[in-house]
A protein has these predicted regions:
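An acidic, charge-biased composition feature
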Residues: 1-290
Length: 290
């Protein structure tokens, strides 16, 4: 496994999208995945399964960076960086705040890859989670293929992915368990928003028309048969294999993380995910009542 970080001069999903598309165009393979991150400044983290030439990977990443980021582009300074990431750093990981540290200048940097074994069920599942992430990245790239990716494109792609995940999860573990997963995701993001000073009673409004539209989509897909989901968003490979053998609470944690990483790749991770899980919870429970 090799890794490289492409640091950008400013925050914004559009610039990240462009660099990701360019790297995908120059990298000669599909055995890689990416995440967006903020610590040390806005950047894209590239991980390749191939453990070959690290110098070549750096060169390709620099090629993507140089093609997209203009020379002399104004960059964040330390104060602007700290202001931009304050809420994220305060919310932290697992309720523990993160020190945002110093801003790193825009450019390409080699980086070690440290797998988050515990988050995804242990070292035994490492090969499986790698396949899930490369598959997720390939799906996300389809949504990011446009020069102008709107918020609606991002959220529609996120909704299709999570509905497919829920469909597979319900088939494997039962509908009641899938409803519990949707509610666990909504509750998790409510806690995260509260940590970001949104207020302990904060609620993200979800319109009734949006709920009705999503519920209608689910009904139409069910009526069309199991192949319909494959047309819209191919099922995340190996996810159910990864989850077998864990109790429901652990399965929920692993799957919420997998969904979050997919949304991150789409550029709609974080705050929008509360609305997404609220919507999916609504849809799942509406279907249960019918």
């Amino acid at each position: 496994m090799r890794a490289v970080h492409i640091h950008l001069p400013n925050f914004g999903p559009e610039l990240e999208d462009a660099v990701i598309r360019e790297f995908a165009a120059v990298y000669p393979g599909h055995d890689w995945f990416f995440v967006r991150y903020w610590l040390g400044g806005p950047h894209v983290r590239i991980r390749t399964v191939d453990s070959g030439d690290a110098v070549e990977l750096l060169a390709l990443a620099r090629q993507a960076f140089d093609s997209i980021v203009p020379q002399g582009n104004p960059e964040l300074d330390q104060d602007a960086y700290l202001d931009a990431v304050r809420d994220l750093a305060t919310a932290g990981e697992g309720g523990i705040a993160i020190d945002p540290g110093d801003l790193r200048p825009a450019g390409v940097y080699p980086a070690p890859y440290v797998p988050e074994y515990e988050r995804y069920g242990g070292a035994a599942g490492f090969d499986t989670i790698t396949r899930v992430f490369t598959h997720s990245s390939a799906i996300a790239l389809r949504a990011l293929a446009h020069d102008a990716v709107t918020p609606n494109i991002r959220m529609n792609a996120a909704l299709l992915y999570v509905l497919r995940v829920m469909s597979d999860y319900a088939r494997e573990f039962g509908r009641e368990e899938a409803c519990a997963l949707a509610e666990a995701g909504r509750a998790f993001w409510h806690r995260q928003l509260s940590g970001e000073r949104a207020g302990s009673g904060a609620r993200v409004p979800v319109s009734e028309s949006a709920v009705a539209k999503a519920a209608g989509l689910v009904r139409d897909l069910r009526a069309a048969g199991p192949g319909a989901f494959d047309v819209l968003a191919p099922g995340p490979a190996d996810i159910t294999e990864l989850l077998r053998g864990w109790n429901p609470q652990r399965r929920h944690g692993i799957l919420i993380s997998i969904i979050h990483m997919h949304n991150n790749r789409l550029g709609c991770g974080g705050r929008p995910e509360y609305a997404l899980f609220h919507l999916v919870s609504h849809v799942m429970n509406t279907g249960r009542e019918q």
